[in-house]
Amino acid sequence: MLKSNLEVDNRFSLIGKVADFPKRNKSPSGIDHCLFYLEHRSNKKEAGFTRQAWCKIAIQISGNQLIEKTQSITVGQQLLVVGFVTSHRSSNGLNQLVLHAEQIEFIE
């Protein structure tokens, strides 16, 4: 527990643009999934200097409530994604950081 009484141990939020078309599938247990990449670019102050921040991260969306929101996601659209991060092992054996979305907000 933090001094602020917040229970935050794995919380991540990122604003960025959708970098590719969402890929949808259904698990053997019948759960709908959607995967796409979000690209973030910004300028941040660090140690008194401005630096460019850039990342491209996989976004995993699962379950019926959020999957409905993915129907209107298009490449280039700006989103706020909030969720938790975990590592997935890709088919080539490399670990990749993935943001599992719990909240999605479209930014105009």
UniProtKB/Swiss-Prot annotation:
Q: Sorted alphabetically, which Pfam families does this protein's record hold?
A: SSB_1
Lineage, opening ranks:
Bacteria, Pseudomonadati, Pseudomonadota, Gammaproteobacteria, Pasteurellales
List the GO cellular component terms: primosome complex
Q: Which UniProt keywords apply?
A: DNA replication, DNA-binding, Primosome
Asked if the Swiss-Prot or TrEMBL record annotates the protein with the keyword Aminoacyl-tRNA synthetase, the reply is: no
Residues in domain SSB?
8-108
Q: How does it assemble?
A: Homodimer. Interacts with PriA and DnaT. Component of the replication restart primosome. Primosome assembly occurs via a 'hand-off' mechanism. PriA binds to replication forks, subsequently PriB then DnaT bind; DnaT then displaces ssDNA to generate the helicase loading substrate.
Q: Can you say what this protein is called?
A: Replication restart protein PriB
Which GO terms label this protein's molecular function in UniProt? single-stranded DNA binding
Q: Which InterPro entries match?
A: NA-bd_OB-fold (IPR012340), Primosome_PriB/ssb (IPR000424), Prisomal_replication_PriB (IPR023646)
Family designation:
Belongs to the PriB family.
